[in-house]
Amino acid sequence: FNIILIMNHLLTTRMEISEIASQSKEIHQWIVEKRRTIHRHPELMYEEFETSKLVQNTLKELKIPYKKDIAITGVVGTIGNGNAPCIALRADMDALPIHEETDIDFKSEIDGKMHACGHDCHTAMLLGAARVLKENEHKINGTIKLIFQPAEEGGAGGKMMREQGVLLEPKVQQIFALHVAGTIPVGTLASKEGTLLAATSSIKILVKGKGGHAAAPHHTNDPVVTGSKIVVELQTLVSRELNPLEPGVISITMANAGSAFNVIPSTMELQGTIRSLTIEGVSNLQKRVKEVAQSIALANRCEAEVSFPGNDYPPTINDAGCWQLGKSAAKEILGEENLIEMPDPIMGGEDFAYYTEEVPGCFSFLGVGNPDIDAIYDVHHPMFKVDETALSLGTAIHVNTALKALENLN
């Protein structure tokens, strides 16, 4: 009986905050090198084969058991005793089809592809957490899943990972993620309880008309003029049909038509995005986009084929208890003065929402901005940079969050 008590005490001996911070800082350069390797070789959604291999090889070196090829390139490592309680930490791995314009030594080696959303940082920080947690596995009473997922950037990799059972066996009870943010100072963390990020949808409108010579527009049904009217009129859906107190966005971001200056083309293609704080709001806007586009096309003797390709992401909603826990864990690493309680949601979207539809969770932003090194740009910008001092801080926050969550669940 005494031996059992002693063993239970050893299993539940909590790592001190100073230990978490120092052990994370000790491997800072290791984390940075992982990040830079991934940054040099960006891979788009569902093509993260080399990144996945790097994750697998690292977990193998750390003697962490893992499952691979989940959602094509996803990897899930497991630390702990394999029993309940179980929490998960998640990182995404995919890059963006953006040509990098920074001057960093380790910039993308692949033209037209860049880690402009910080997923290289997310993967490296979680690998850092894996190393620290594995070295202290004897202090873990429960199970920690490390979810490395593909295709956050529009591919709904989180949805596929969820459908393939990453939240089961053992069942995940809480899930946490960090996302770097270039517009808040390095060493700060921002989030809120409740709705944090919007539900999203893509838009594709193909306007079909009748082409002809530009000097004889009366013999054509001009899809360019018609498409332009559609773009303008869609903005009135937000300004005149939505409740002014209900956030919503319709942005047309791509317009393609024609190949010669003196020819009216027969088609014009429009693409864009819809954002709302509810999936019902997205559905309502989709309905009205279709009605408006088709009506304007008909009035101009054209046709409009309207579709919403890809995946409609649900809103990302932070569980109140998970945010309080995450905030407490971050405060112990960063200091209370470096926590930002966001007053409002933002209209970006995240497929982390697919996990929090199933289990309570919390998604937070980790500041990586620093004007001294020109790290002033937001994500999805070709000049996006990060202050890498944030990486070991992110690792420490992951570790502390995981241990506190298991402690509370126990």
Task: State the predicted function of each range.
Residues 38, 77, 89, 119, ...:
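Divalent metal-coordination and catalytic microenvironments
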